[in-house]
Structures are given as structure tokens and as C-alpha cells.
Amino acid sequence: MTMDGDSSTTDASQLGISADYIGGSHYVIQPHDDTEDSMNDHEDTNGSKESFREQDIYLPIANVARIMKNAIPQTGKIAKDAKECVQECVSEFISFITSEASERCHQEKRKTINGEDILFAMSTLGFDSYVEPLKLYLQKFREAMKGEKGIGGAVTATDGLSEELTEEAFTNQLPAGLITTDGQQQNVMVYTTSYQQISGVQQIQFS
């Protein structure tokens, strides 16, 4: 009898039965699921791999600092915390505008965000003073890229852009009051990282 009891105990332990689940002659078996734990470990590993540092989602601080230096005297200096602050603000601004433009594309069942979507988003979010100069810049940019394509015959990144920006098309997308000047003098500086490489496109200032 003792041997049978030992045998039962051995069998139970081999099946992973703990004493808490043994009651009388009934056994409750809770096998250890190695597959589930393995999947959980895999998920934890993926989660750690997909985590990014906060700085990784921001614009390069060197580019931000270069733009900031253009607005101060040559002898001026910019502290590191000031650069990081502007870096975060600019990155958040880009995300803010792009999110609104993406929502418009989603409503119109389009997958590509174009220049008009960005301008529409800026006007919707209250950045009306930037719409007119950016509209002109976008038009000049497309004309310059068109000219380069005609001369060299090279395929450029703007091939996927939508129809040429016209006054009529833009008026249909934006309220008329948002794309016309209001008589007040406003200085808006438009920066681009590629204007030096494209003929006909320069840094422009409107007043």
C-alpha cells in the first residue's frame, strides 16, 4: 500500500499537481504551459526592442540649431537647453500639423498627404498668416522642380504630387478669408533645407 501511495505521489508530482489541489481521491491537474510563457517572453522582448528614446523622434538638433543661428547676430550664442526646447517644439508642431492633414486624407479616402493638405491643416488650426506665403512658396517650388525635370529628364520626388496648385483649386479647399491678406503687415520667414540645391527656389520673406 505504501508503495502504491508513493507511486501515486510520484505520478502526481510528475504531472505538476501541487498539494493544494489534491482533495481526497480527486486530482486537479494544472499543467505548466511552456508555450504561453515563451510567447509572453517574446512579447516582452519585442516591446523592449520597439521602445525608442525620446530624442529619436525629434528633428536632428544640429539642423534646429542651424536655423536658430540664422535669426541671431553672428556673435550670438544659443544654450543647449534652448536648442533642445526648440527641437521639441518644432517636432511637436510638425506632428500636430501632419495629424490634421492626415485626418483630411482619411476623410477623402486618400493615402498620400500633399502640399494642399498641409496648408489646409495650418489654416484649420489657426496658422492663417503662414498660408499665403507657403502657398506661394509651394508654387515656386513646384515650378522649379518642373523646370529641372524638363531639362535633365530626371525623375524627382515630386512626381507623386497632385495636380498643379492653382488659384481656383486652392480656393475650393480653403475659405476665401483665410488665403487673402488682411491689410496688416506681417513678416513670415519660410525655411527649407533644400532650397540651396534647387535652382529658382530661394529663401523668401513676405511683408
From Swiss-Prot:
PROSITE patterns: NFYB_HAP3. Residues 27-52 are annotated as: Disordered. Residues 86-97 are annotated as: Subunit association domain (SAD). Gene3D superfamilies: Histone, subunit A. Residues 1-52 are annotated as: A domain. Residues 39-52 have a biased composition (Basic and acidic residues). Monoubiquitination at Lys-140 plays an important role in transcriptional activation by allowing the deposition of histone H3 methylations as well as histone H2B monoubiquitination at 'Lys-121'. It is found in: Nucleus. The keyword Transcription applies. GO terms for biological process: cellular response to leukemia inhibitory factor; positive regulation of transcription by RNA polymerase II; regulation of DNA-templated transcription; regulation of transcription by RNA polymerase II. Heterotrimeric transcription factor composed of three components, NF-YA, NF-YB and NF-YC. NF-YB and NF-YC must interact and dimerize for NF-YA association and DNA binding. Interacts with C1QBP. Can be divided into 3 domains: the weakly conserved A domain, the highly conserved B domain thought to be involved in subunit interaction and DNA binding, and the Glu-rich C domain. Component of the sequence-specific heterotrimeric transcription factor (NF-Y) which specifically recognizes a 5'-CCAAT-3' box motif found in the promoters of its target genes. NF-Y can function as both an activator and a repressor, depending on its interacting cofactors. This is Nuclear transcription factor Y subunit beta. It comes from Homo sapiens (Human). The lineage of its organism: Eukaryota, Metazoa, Chordata, Craniata, Vertebrata.
